[in-house]
A protein has these predicted regions:
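Structural motif
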Residues: 57, 64-66, 73, 89, ...
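Short strand-coil-strand connectors
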Residues: 30, 68-72, 95
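Ligand-binding loop in jelly-roll beta-barrel domains
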Residues: 86-110
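A cytosolic small-molecule/anion-sensing beta-strand core signal
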Residues: 61-62, 78, 96
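Short, conserved beta-strand element in jelly-roll/cupin
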Residues: 40, 51-67
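Conserved short histidine dyad/triad with adjacent acidic residue
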Residues: 35-52, 86
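Short acidic-glycine-tyrosine-enriched beta hairpin
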Residues: 71-86
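A short, N-terminal "cap"/entry segment at the start of jelly-roll beta-barrel domains
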Residues: 1-38
Length: 113
């Protein structure tokens, strides 16, 4: 494995929900167990009621990201990050213009065992 610069240039973004797009830049082709990529909000949006099957760190490059879990809201602004543990049930919320980077472990969380 070699050291690699990660950018969102030329990555295909796909819509997760209206207003929220993801582009994967860390895949099993480039690392052993990490997954990750970029997220951007083209409008105010939320992705509700997701139960994580992995540990995740979300870093906010610009804008504001909010995670709601167990009735508690955690907001991160530019330069801040949020840690979400495996098993947490969350709602992701972002404002239009928010851009972030996410890293998760393990990358193959949805693999059949």
């Amino acid at each position: 494995m070699t050291v690699k610069l990660l950018t969102d240039h030329d990555l295909p973004f796909s819509e997760l929900v209206p207003g929220m797009e993801l582009a994967r830049s860390i895949t099993n082709a480039g690392t052993t167990q990490l997954g990750g990529g970029y997220m951007k909000f083209t409008e105010d949006a939320e992705f509700p009621d997701w139960t994580l099957k992995y540990d995740e760190v979300l870093f906010v490059q610009s804008g504001e990201l909010e995670i709601v879990s167990d009735g508690r809201s955690v907001k991160a602004n530019e330069g801040q990050a949020i840690l979400i543990p495996d098993g947490a049930k969350v709602t992701y919320r972002g404002r239009a213009g928010t851009v972030g980077f996410f890293v998760l472990w393990p990358f193959d969380w949805n693999k059949e065992t």
